[in-house]
């Protein structure tokens, strides 16, 4: 599924919807470089998908950005965010 980088106005009001297991470098390959983290994250991807779904991928309460295999949080306004992120990840990383 096609996506663009979203800004904070689009991701405002998102919250935890699910998780995905991945390496940091895999997320960078699929979704590009992340934004700097906020109060309780070190990095975050903010994404707007072509179907209107908005999603975030982030670590939570980590002291350093996880580089190994990690259970990343997926935020959104509905469970569709999890589907959009995981299906795009699988499609792109298997290509």
Feature annotation, model-predicted:
Residues 1-95:
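Residues within mature, well-folded domains
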């Amino acid at each position: 599924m096609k996506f663009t980088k979203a800004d904070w106005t689009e991701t405002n009001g998102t919250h935890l919807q699910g998780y995905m297991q991945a390496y940091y470098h895999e997320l960078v390959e699929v979704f590009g470089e992340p934004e700097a983290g906020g109060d309780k994250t070190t990095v975050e991807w903010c994404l707007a998908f072509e179907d209107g779904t908005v999603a975030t991928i982030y670590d939570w309460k980590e002291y350093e950005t996880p580089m190994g295999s990690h259970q990343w949080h997926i935020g959104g306004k509905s469970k569709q965010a999890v589907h959009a992120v995981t299906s795009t990840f699988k499609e792109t990383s298997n290509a």
